[in-house]
Swiss-Prot record:
Topological category with respect to the lipid bilayer: Lipid-anchor
Lipidation sites (S-diacylglycerol cysteine): 22
Region entry Disordered, spans: 147-168
Record protein name field: Peptidoglycan-associated lipoprotein
Record GO biological process: cell division
Signal peptide residues on this chain, from the entry's feature table: 1-21
Lineage of origin: Bacteria, Pseudomonadati, Pseudomonadota, Gammaproteobacteria, Pseudomonadales
Function: Part of the Tol-Pal system, which plays a role in outer membrane invagination during cell division and is important for maintaining outer membrane integrity.
Lipidation (N-palmitoyl cysteine): 22
The protein's assembly and partners: The Tol-Pal system is composed of five core proteins: the inner membrane proteins TolA, TolQ and TolR, the periplasmic protein TolB and the outer membrane protein Pal. They form a network linking the inner and outer membranes and the peptidoglycan layer.
Amino acid sequence: MEMLKFGKFAALALAMAVAVGCSSKGGDASGEGANGGVDPNAGYGANSGAVDGSLSDEAALRAITTFYFEYDSSDLKPEAMRALDVHAKDLKGSGQRVVLEGHTDERGTREYNMALGERRAKAVQRYLVLQGVSPAQLELVSYGKERPVATGHDEQSWAQNRRVELKK
C-alpha cells in the first residue's frame, strides 16, 4: 500500500514539476518559478532535466540513496542514473567512502539472490566509476534476501526489496 501511495505521489510531483516548468509567469525574467520549477520534496527525477543544475533539484536527487530494480534484473533505471550523477559529483575527489548494499526479494534460492544482490551493487559501482569516482571509494556488500524492508509476500513488497542502498 505504501509503494502505491509513493507511486501516486511521485506521479503527482512529476506532473506538478512539468506544469510549473511549462507555465509562464510575468515578472520573473528567468522563466523559472520561485523554486526553479522543481518540487524539492519530489522523489525520483521530478524535474527530468528541465532546469539542469538547479540547487533544489540536486538536493532532491542527493536525498535519493536507494535505487530500485525490476524483477531478476541488475539494470539501472534512468531515474537512478540521475541521482547517481549527483552522488558521483559529490564523491569525485572527496576521498569519502561509501558502501553499496545489494538486496533482492524473497523469491529464488539464497545463493542466487546473493549473486543477484552483488550484480546490482556492481551495476551501481560501474556507473559511479564511469562518472569518475575512484573504485577505492566504493565497498560492495550483497545481502540477497536476508534484509527485507517490506515483509509482505506480494509484488508491492518484493518491489521495495529489490534495491541497492548507498550508505555513507
